[in-house]
Amino acid sequence: MVVAYLRVSTNKQHLENQQEEIKKFAAHRGLDIDKWYHDVVSGKVHSNDRKLGDLLESLQEGDCLIVTEVSRLSRTLIDIMNIINTCIQRKIVLHSTKEGYTFENNLN
C-alpha cells in the first residue's frame, strides 16, 4: 500500500501544494497513492496525537509512506528520528520528495 501524508500548521496554509508535489513524485516512480492522510495541526503535537499516529500503526511491512519533507512528520528532531527508525524497523519505505530522501531497510 502506498500512503501519502500531508500536514499544515494552520488553516491559512494549503495542502494542495504538498498534494501536487506528492502526485508528481508518485507518477515519476510509477506509484499509485492508495490513501491520503492530512492534518491541520502544529508539528510540535506528538505524532500519536495526530492522524499520523493512526497512519503509522496501520502500515505494514512493504508499505510505502510519502511526505514532501521530513518536517511534515514533526518539528522535533527526536520525533522525526523515531518515526524514521520505526519505518525502517518495520520495513516500511519512507520517501521525502523535496529532500530526495528514501529511508528503507536495505543495508543488509
Where are these regions (language model features)?
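Short, structured surface patches at the beginning of a domain
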Residues: 1-108
